[in-house]
Amino acid sequence: EIAPFVGFALFDFTVYWTHRFYHEIPVLWEFHSIHHSTEELDWVSGFRGHPFDGTLVAPAFIFLIAAGFSLELTGIFAVAQVLLGLFLHANVRWRLRPLHRLVITPEFHHWHHSNEKDAIWTNYSTFLPIWDLLFGTYFMPKDKRPQVYGVDEHIPDGIIEQLKYPLRDMGNPLW
């Protein structure tokens, strides 16, 4: 049956654009910047983020369900994404270059988290780098690894302060 493969491609395509919007639309970046603020990438970094940032993939799941894909298949994609996120953020130095144009690797995703000028608007894909290749956001320099992580903005320390950070200019009377 081809439906799971079509669903997978549609899911990945939707997550690519949602993720890209989180970087390119300033109000969304306010939330997503917390995930990118870590200056040392490791598997725990995959869990660092504002709760609203978790809605990043919601459109992809809603799209799958609306398109008639089963809840089971949608759940499999959800679990796969969490597990892959742990792997992609891991502090590993594996040379998986032959795979970079076929599947996302930790090195590919580390470039996405890099705060180096040439890498900032790149590598949004979740599973398949084809979307970055098609839309001009693929970045994998040869024989070089990211040296600088984090963001230019000052993100406060502490969970409460990070929860409030994206809302700081919205006139919230509670703080």
Regions found by a protein language model. Give the residues of each.
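Membrane-embedded catalytic scaffold of the fatty acid hydroxylase/desaturase
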Residues: 1-147
